[in-house]
UniProtKB/Swiss-Prot annotation:
It comes from the Bacteria. Keywords: Ribonucleoprotein, Ribosomal protein, RNA-binding, rRNA-binding. Part of the 50S ribosomal subunit. This is Large ribosomal subunit protein uL4. One of its GO terms (molecular function) is rRNA binding. One of its GO terms (biological process) is translation. One of the primary rRNA binding proteins, this protein initially binds near the 5'-end of the 23S rRNA. It is important during the early stages of 50S assembly. It makes multiple contacts with different domains of the 23S rRNA in the assembled 50S subunit and ribosome.
């Protein structure tokens, strides 16, 4: 499939052939969902922790005698039934990450690219270059109508462009190896350079 290539100033710069296996799939929400869950679960710190009845700072002495008070039978003040007592089966420090095969992760990335293509939210640009001035780049981005965009460059990111883009709200740039399903789906517009297209095709073949 062919898609027009533009420059940062909006001028046309020819066209590019996109691989059907990467950009022409019928997007499946279940595949995208599984990959996004895998990404977000692996990113979760898992540092949540509450104290059990053996860890709270209370005496383990029985609070009153067993019989003869007319009240319910109780043991230590640290029991979960009391305010300030331990928590029964509360969260512990653990990893939320789970395994997902490399083949499935690649498939998810192909479906994410295809989803952007199908939605008309994919833009191919000739290259990313800048004089390092944030104001000039922000004006170009505004003229192109990119409000929340992710730019995928080639194997390495143009450092001058990255510096200029750093303070533009809603604009992010990643190298090809950093391209992932979550970041692609989170943005309204996916922008890929010609070098990025070639690198993605080499990575996902």
């Amino acid at each position: 499939m062919k898609l027009d290539v533009i420059k940062l100033d909006g001028a046309k710069a020819g066209s590019v052939d996109l691989d059907e296996a990467l950009f022409g799939l019928e997007p499946r929400a279940d595949i995208l969902h599984r990959v996004v869950r895998w990404q977000r679960n692996n990113a979760q710190a898992g540092t949540h922790k509450v104290k059990t009845r053996s860890e709270v700072n209370y005496s383990t002495k029985k609070i009153y005698r067993q019989k003869g008070t007319g009240g319910a039978r109780h043991g230590a003040r640290s029991a979960p039934i009391f305010r300030g007592g331990g928590v029964y089966k509360g969260p512990k420090v653990r990893s939320h990450g789970h395994e997902l095969t490399k083949k499935f992760r690649k498939l998810g990335l192909c479906h994410a690219l295809s989803a952007k293509m199908k939605a008309g939210e994919l833009v191919i640009i000739d290259e990313v270059s800048s004089d390092g001035k944030t104001a000039a780049l922000a004006k170009q981005v505004a003229n192109l109508g990119w409000k929340r965009a992710l730019i995928i460059d080639g194997a390495t990111v143009n450092e001058t462009f990255a510096q200029a883009a750093r303070n533009i709200d809603g604009l992010d740039i990643l190298p090809t190896m950093g391209a992932n399903v979550y970041d692609i789906l989170k943005r309204d517009t996916l922008v890929i350079t010609k070098a990025g297209v070639e690198a993605l095709e080499a990575r996902l073949k």
